[in-house]
Amino acid sequence: MKSNLKKLSLFIGTIIICIAMVTGCSKKDEIKDAFNVYKDVWIKQDFKSMYDMLSTDSKSYIGEEEFLERYNNIYGAIEASNMDIQIVGEKERDKKSLEIPFTMTMNTMVGKIELKDFEATLVKEDNAYKIKWNESLIFPQMQPEDKVRVDDYYAKRGSILDRNGNFLAQDDMVKSIGIHPSKFENEKVAKIKSMAAILDISESYIEEQLAANTNPEHLVPIVSVLKYDSEKLNNLSGIEGIQINNKNSRVYTGGESIGNLIGYVSPITAEELENNKDKGYSHTSLIGKAGIEKVYEDTLRGQDGGEIYIERGEEKISIAKTEAKNGQDIKLSIDPELQAKIYSEMKGKKGASTAVDPKTGEVLAMVSSPSYDPNVFVTYKTKTIKEQWEKLDGEQFDNRFNNVYAPGSTMKLVTAAIGLDEGVLNPEEGMDIKGLEWQKDASWGGYKITRVKDPGKDINLRDAVKYSDNIYFARVALNIGEDAFINGAKNFGIGEEITFEYPMESSQISNDKTLSKEILLADTGYGQGEVLMSPLDVALAYSALGNNGDIMQPRLNVGENGEAKVWKSAIKAEKVPALVDAFSAVINDADGTAANAKVDGFNIAGKTGTSEIKKDQKDESGKENGWFVAVNTDDSKIAISMIIEDVKDRGGSSIPTAMVKNVMEYYLKK
């Protein structure tokens, strides 16, 4: 009997313990469930729902409006995002509450941070568990009366330097022009009129900025002006109520001549921010939009730093800190004076020009015309600029120096070099050509190749280059043959992707990389067909005449790529003199196509070219582009190519010829 009673007592005790355990587990689960709800709305930064889950005494301690304001202000200031909360244990304090330790990670303006030693206390009220809140649920170290502060450490963007180490782009100061409304009120209409005239902006724009302001003691920003624009600044400083302050800004040197090459920075867009969301950008960041500023964005941009800290009286308690990391400088091979000279010679005509040093491969100039002054994007657009840009209809942003074009007769150097190397061309031997038209045979149907001049005699290489005889070079190309021509062109980099620090369109020998059709091969020989080259490709090809047949690896970023090395052995050294003689005749001989490009004291080899853009041979409405390329061959310093678009009935290749002559004379004699 006693034994049975003992067994019964043991059974009942076990049941009681189990019930207690289940009840305890159930309570802890309820608390964790409640905290998980709080955690989820916290991660979403749903501060209203967070406040709704506070205990009664917590709501007495802090009102809803203050709660929302504190979290919004703090999280906004630190740029909190991508939050995560992990429970790391539990501690039962009494029968009605449970403390849940947790850690938090988030992305902030100082990078990703981890906050440890959080503890949330949950208490039961009306059959539900509530959060017992205090300041330590903002940051674990935080106490009442503490303030959260943020210091920004701004990184400096790397500078862009020219070959001499002078600035083409740098972080500097501009002058911010603003109006102090209360001091501007007297004779306001006259002041607005005067200010608009000085700045070349509309009076209505100034009026709109003033109308949007509600506090007469608040400065109203109008525009920013370059600090060396002394005429504007002096005239503005005499107007009462105008305030001029320094403002950090990107600043460019070189004006329109460097616009398409250097590019510009401006505020990041929402789309750009999304596309670069893991790179440390914020909604206040500047980002490269074009040119070198865009190509080298990752190198130039700095990484901003900062510190998040708690201010407790005189004490500063650091939460997280990251030092700013300045961007890297870039040194270019560009000669800014040469760049400016080329641009001024082009006089706004649509086209492009590239100059290289034949001995080193350094790119001395890369010009696109028309262009823009990058400073417009960090200051403002005057009415004059707006009118000019409306007429250009976006043409100023078309970066032409990295476009590819039909090279026209400038291709004849490539054809001649291949012919000499292949042994199918004897420079002294005359070719019998009669008339101004030619076709290989009747299989060409009605298609004929034409030339401008019939000298009435057999012509050799020198004559053919000097007179720019298309028939001669078409026949040389046919004698070379498809495979040899394609392979020979590759010795000049044609049809290959060029290794260069600036994105360029790739040259091509034809659309399908073959020259299997006779007419296409023949046309390619004198620069028509489907062959395409950039101004850089053309300048490099002719640089071989000044460097014993070698083409150097083109270099733009000399700070990173400082070693000169051969890229292509384009022409056999023993063949160079014959080519120099032939292509110098274009300039040195009185009847050469570029006789007016001679520079006293220097031997210059070069070639004019006109490339036709038309549907077929009968099309007379097509446009023409004019080329000229030149290289000084003795102690060679420069090879320069230039293309001017749409020169038909306007002077043809004589337009770039005159421009390049002036540039060569300037550069060689300076």
Task: Annotate each language-model stretch with its function.
Residues 3-28:
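Sec-dependent N-terminal signal peptides of Gram-positive bacterial secreted proteins and lipoproteins
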Residues 27, 33, 37, 48-99:
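Short solvent-exposed beta->alpha transition segments
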Residues 33-40, 44, 48-52, 65, ...:
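Solvent-exposed, polar/charged alpha-helical surfaces in well-ordered, non-transmembrane soluble domains
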Residues 36-39, 53-58, 106-109, 146-151, ...:
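Second-shell loop/turn segments in exported
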Residues 81-352, 372-396, 404:
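Extracytoplasmic/periplasmic proteins that interact with beta-lactams or build/remodel peptidoglycan
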Residues 104-106, 265, 545-546, 643-646:
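Short beta-strand segments enriched in hydrophobic/aromatic residues
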Residues 311-319, 359-409, 414-644, 652:
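Beta-lactam-recognizing serine transpeptidase/beta-lactamase-like catalytic domain environment
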Residues 353-358:
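Short hydrophobic alpha-helical segments used for membrane anchoring or interfacial signaling
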